[in-house]
Amino acid sequence: MVSIIYYSMTGNTKKMAMAMAEELGVKALNVKDAASLPNDGILLIGSGCYGDKPGEPMAKFIANNDFGGRKVALFGTSGAGAGNEVAAMAEALKQKGAEVIGNYHSAGRAFVVANIGHPNKDELSAARKFAREMASIG
């Protein structure tokens, strides 16, 4: 089983999470609604990029949970960065005991104008493929 948890301020990461959830036949859960770490096997965790870091709600979720031995795949969107939020999440999760098994990053709309239309159809298709590949590892 796979659980998808995301944080999205502008809707870009939510769009990606929903595409992956649809592909896998599971629900995507906003981190603000995640009271605790799901007991399911693989976790797909995603966030937008805010100052080269994941959003504060996601950073707190990672800090407040024990990921010991859990397989985690990461995804993210950013308008101006190059996936730095994914790297920051990977480092934090490894420190919390997670096994990071993969990551996917896509452009997202930033500052209202930059990257309008992202994640686009091709990026969402790639995200779906990524989700299938990560689910098959578990």
Regions found by a protein language model. Name each.
Residues V2-S3, S8-D33, L37-G138:
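FMN-binding flavodoxin-like domain, especially the glycine-rich phosphate-binding loop
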